[in-house]
From Swiss-Prot:
The record marks 28 as: Within the serine palmitoyltransferase (SPT) complex, defines the length of the acyl chain-binding pocket, determining the acyl-CoA substrate preference. It is a multi-pass membrane protein. The gene is SPTSSA. PANTHER family: SERINE PALMITOYLTRANSFERASE SMALL SUBUNIT A. This is Serine palmitoyltransferase small subunit A. Belongs to the SPTSS family. SPTSSA subfamily.
Amino acid sequence: MAGMALARAWKQMSWFYYQYLLVTALYMLEPWERTVFNSMLVSIVGMALYTGYVFMPQHIMAILHYFEIVQ
């Protein structure tokens, strides 16, 4: 039973990856180009998440002070 669930999850992830390749047109690139693109994408998303994690609390507190929700 667990094997079937794992196989179904693998099939679903393969389908999502295939859709990702089609939507971004990565299926036309060579493997090394695809690796470069994916590396850059992961780096940019990682930096955006880190920046949001670091600076978002400061901005939220500034907004709350501006609207006098927090003293």
